[in-house]
Amino acid sequence: MLVSATEMLKKAKAGHYAVGQFNINNLEWTKSILLTAQELKSPVILGVSEGAGKYMTGFKTVAAMVKAMDEELGITVPVALHLDHGTYEGCYKCIKAGFTSIMFDGSHYPFEENLAKSTELVNVAHNLGLSIECEVGSIGGEEDGVVGMGECADPKECKAIADLGIDFLAAGIGNIHGKYPANWQGLNFEVLENVKKEVGDMPLVLHGGTGIPADMIKKAISLGVAKINVNTECQLSFAAATREYIEAGKDLQGKGFDPRKLLAPGAEAIKATVKEKMELFGSVGKA
């Protein structure tokens, strides 16, 4: 059964581990992540960007697929279906489609407008039993054509957004989406500590989890990060395994061209990546 992300992240914060948000792009992605979460007895958040939602023909299709798959695979661990970096309009579409959690990314609005829109969406989400994440300080890199440099959030602005009653907060601390460049300065733990002081027990979210060294991940968790987003790393694993299968000529052997065979190595690679991350985040056995 799908649930909001509120309880799983409160438990993660209290237990000093993090729950992974793994973004889904299609059936194979969703199935691989759900099966791994079940095998490892880990809670999980399935993230859906607006671009991925559009690719899968719309949020209603995504919600129907995830709900049916959760049931037919016999998944018993907590699963949240979460809109990633949602626009104001996108949040309403996902609420209507049956998502259990939303993220409103108002970081590109003037702060007062971000505050007003966030307030409205918090009320709507909570009235329906959904969890809501908001963002302060844009996350760098590129995601679905949106490019940012990796700003650090203002802790006072974080407090103002947290005080609206959101369930978890994404604060920019120098993290970026996609592959990290060679000249990346690392996570700014001073900013993270200051944000934590301002927002108290609010679970914090680390976007751009791909390529952040394990020691930094563990330190971020010790400072209140309870949700870590991973997308690019699963995509890279999937692409590498699929390339290897085709370069080895396996698609030309027998019925190796059958998509169920062609996509299987990539699906297994996603499982391996998700397992590695769940072990690093400490969520194994926490369902």
Q: Language-model features: where?
A:
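Metal-dependent phosphohydrolase cores
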Residues: Q21, P213, P259
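Glycine- and aromatic-enriched membrane alpha-helices
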Residues: A239, R243-E244
